[in-house]
Amino acid sequence: MVEDVELNRLYWHSRRGMLELDVLLVPFVREVYPHLNDVDRDLYRRLLTCEDQDMFGWFMQRAESEDAELQRMVRMILDRVQPQ
């Protein structure tokens, strides 16, 4: 189980100040992150180190990350709100 301290920290790191990112990342960290395996948790934390403008392009599907694993996490987050 994910510790409350870790979830709170990730919650605040997921709040990017850009509404388009906040509406995707904040619910994901609250509802999905606790159920991810360790590899995907690490991947989500790595995603949070990316620049907001890069993430915006990926989530708006204007571009794809050159990192296939990061793109997989982007897809996982998008599939939560718009299943294919």
Curated annotation (Swiss-Prot):
SUPFAM superfamilies hit by this protein: YgfY-like (SSF109910)
Gene3D superfamilies reported in the protein's UniProt record: Flavinator of succinate dehydrogenase (1.10.150.250)
A Gene Ontology BP annotation from the UniProt entry: succinate metabolic process
One GO cellular component term noted in the UniProt record for this chain: cytoplasm
Matching InterPro entries: SDH, SDH_sf, SdhE_FAD_assembly_factor
Functional description taken from the UniProt entry: An FAD assembly protein, which accelerates covalent attachment of the cofactor into other proteins. Plays an essential role in the assembly of succinate dehydrogenase (SDH, respiratory complex II), an enzyme complex that is a component of both the tricarboxylic acid cycle and the electron transport chain, and which couples the oxidation of succinate to fumarate with the reduction of ubiquinone (coenzyme Q) to ubiquinol. Required for flavinylation (covalent attachment of FAD) of the flavoprotein subunit SdhA of SDH and other flavinylated proteins as well.
Protein name as catalogued: FAD assembly factor SdhE
Provenance organism: Pseudomonas syringae pv. syringae (strain B728a)
Gene: sdhE
